[in-house]
């Protein structure tokens, strides 16, 4: 959720895994919405990190959606990259809960806010977890996983599994 600098980087991270498809929720569908992702992938191609074919495969696994319900209703793992404003994050998670599956994991990419506080307005707080990607998220392998007071063991383990599948090193 959020197609800014971190949201675009994380979309790329997850789409690099052939088993993962990404829906990037954005407020508007601009014609140039893929440009930041393409620019990063082009650099990776020029440095022989990925091939041109891999670039196209990654792009094919990323779709954009403006409707929050459509973006989240079938998701297994939802990560928000919203502005660092507590009420914004709390309200966003509370709204997402209205649409997403009961077993979907709700992750926050915050670097400074408590996942416990972010989960305060959620009904199913046990599925909220922190997943702090270091910037630039598509290059740095480390991801800090922060369990909220309510986070279930299963959600913590599944989050670590998803991050490993995306090629990251969760700690």
Question: What is the role of each PLM region?
Answer:
Residues 124, 145-171:
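Internal alpha-helical scaffold of NAD(P)-dependent oxidoreductase catalytic cores
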Residues 77, 82-143:
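Rossmann-like NAD(P)(H) cofactor-binding subdomain of soluble oxidoreductases
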């Amino acid at each position: 959720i959020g197609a800014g600098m971190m949201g675009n980087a994380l979309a790329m991270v997850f789409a690099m895994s052939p088993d993962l498809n990404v829906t990037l929720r954005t407020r508007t569908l601009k014609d140039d919405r893929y440009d930041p992702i393409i620019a990063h992938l082009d650099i990776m191609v020029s440095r022989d990190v990925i091939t041109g074919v891999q670039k196209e495969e990654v792009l094919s696994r990323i779709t954009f959606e403006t409707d929050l319900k459509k973006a989240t209703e079938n998701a297994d793992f939802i990560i928000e990259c919203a502005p660092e404003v507590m009420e914004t994050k709390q309200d966003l998670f509370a709204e997402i809960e209205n649409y997403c599956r009961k077993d979907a994991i709700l992750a926050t990419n915050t670097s400074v806010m408590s996942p416990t506080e972010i989960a305060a307005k959620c009904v199913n707080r046990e599925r909220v977890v922190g997943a702090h990607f270091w910037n630039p998220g598509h290059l740095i392998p480390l991801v800090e996983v922060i369990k909220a007071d309510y986070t279930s063991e299963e959600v913590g383990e599944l989050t670590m599994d998803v991050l490993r599948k995306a090629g990251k090193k969760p700690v």
